[in-house]
Amino acid sequence: VLACNDSFRAAAPGLEETDCIPVWMFSAAPQAVHVRWPHESAYSVATLKAVLGRYRDSEQAHDVMRQLRPIKEFRRQWFSSIEVSYGRDTSDLLHVRDPATGEPASYRLSVADINQTQNVLLLTAIRKPYSGPPI
C-alpha cells in the first residue's frame, strides 16, 4: 500500500503495521472485518500468485513470502489451490463489517493501472447497501 485515504485505513485496522494486504489478510483483524474471510483470503492468495509470477525475483516478493510462509492457514491455501487471479470481477462485492460500529456494508471494487508499466495499481471501492450473506 503506497497511499490510501482515511476511510480505507479505518476499514482495514492493523494494515498500517504491514502496509501489505496479503500479509495483513492473514492477521487477526481481517477475520473480524471480512464477512466472507475464507473467500477474501483465497482471492488474496490467488492474486499474490499472479503478482509473484511477474516479480518472483524481487526483494519485496521474497520479503512477503518470508512473512507469510510461517502462517499455517496461508500455507494450506497456497498449496491446496492452483487458482491465479489477475483482477476482480466487479460483481464480486467485498462484504465487510465497520470495525467501529459492526455495521455491514458491501463494496464494488475496481482495479486500474495508473501507469503503463503496471507496477502501480489504483484500487477504488464504491460503497453499496449490504447485500452479502446473512450475518
Task: For every predicted segment, state its role.
Residues V1-G87:
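PAS-family sensory domains
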Residues A50-I135:
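C-terminal regulatory/effector modules of DNA-binding transcriptional regulators
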